[in-house]
Amino acid sequence: MPVGRLEGRVAIVTGGSGGLGRAVALDLAREGANLVVQYGRGKDAAQAVVEKVQGLGRKAAAIQSEVTDPGSCRTLAAKALATFGRIDVAACFAGHPFRVEEWNKEFTDLTPAELRRPLDVDLLGSAYVAQAVLPSMAKAGRGSVIFVGSTPAITGDRVGISYQIAKAGILGLTRALALAYGPKGVRVNALALGSITTDPMEAVSAEERRTLAEEPALKRWGSPEEVARVVSFLASDDASYITGQAIVVDGGFALR
C-alpha cells in the first residue's frame, strides 16, 4: 500500500464500531494510521472494523470503554499506549443515539434526562477522552484531537435543542483546549456537521429526508466518507497550522 499522510501514527476513534466512526477509522487506516477502535457495546461490529483495518495492512485493536466514565477513558488511553506506544490522534465520534421524537420535542417538554443525555455522552464524553489522551500528546509535543460539533450549534435551530446545547459546548471546548495545548504542539479542532447519511437517519421518514436534502446549497445529504476525508486532513500535517476551528461540513446548509 502507498505511504499515506498518517504513516506510523496511532489514532483512537471513539464510537469506531459503526456509522461515522467506522468510516473515520477506515479512512485513517487508508492514510497509514494504526487504529484503536473504541466501542461501548458493539464488540462484534468493532472487531469487524479491526479486521478491515488489518486488511488494509495496518495494526488495530478494539478496546471497550464507556466515554461517560472518566476512569474508563483513562484506561482506554493507557491500553492504547501499552499496545502501540503512542497516541497521535483522538477522533471523538461516540455520541448520543439520534431519536426522532426527542429531536422534535418542544424545549419545555424535554425531561431532565433528555436534556442531560447529550451533555453526558457528546460533551462530557468528549472532554473525558481529551483529558485521557492530552497528557501523552503534550509530553510528545504533538497530537490532533478532533471533536464532533454541528451546524445548528452555530446557526441555531428550533428543534434538537438538547443536542444543540451539547454541540455548542463542544465548540467552546475546542477553542479552550486549542489555546491551552497549542503551546505544547497539540491541535484541537471540531467538525460542524450538517445532514449525514448514517444509520440513525433511517428513523427519519422518507418525506422528511427529501425535505432535509433540499436545505443545503448542494441539495443532498453528505456521506460518512466525505466526513472521514476531512478528519484525515485535520489529523495530518496538511493541517499543521489549523487549530481551534469548527470546520463546517454541511453542503452549504449554514448559508441559508
Model-predicted regions and their roles:
Residues T108-A127, R142, I146, I170, ...:
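Catalytic Tyr-X3-Lys loop
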Residues P135, L179-P183, S240:
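Alpha-helical segment proximal to the catalytic Tyr-Lys
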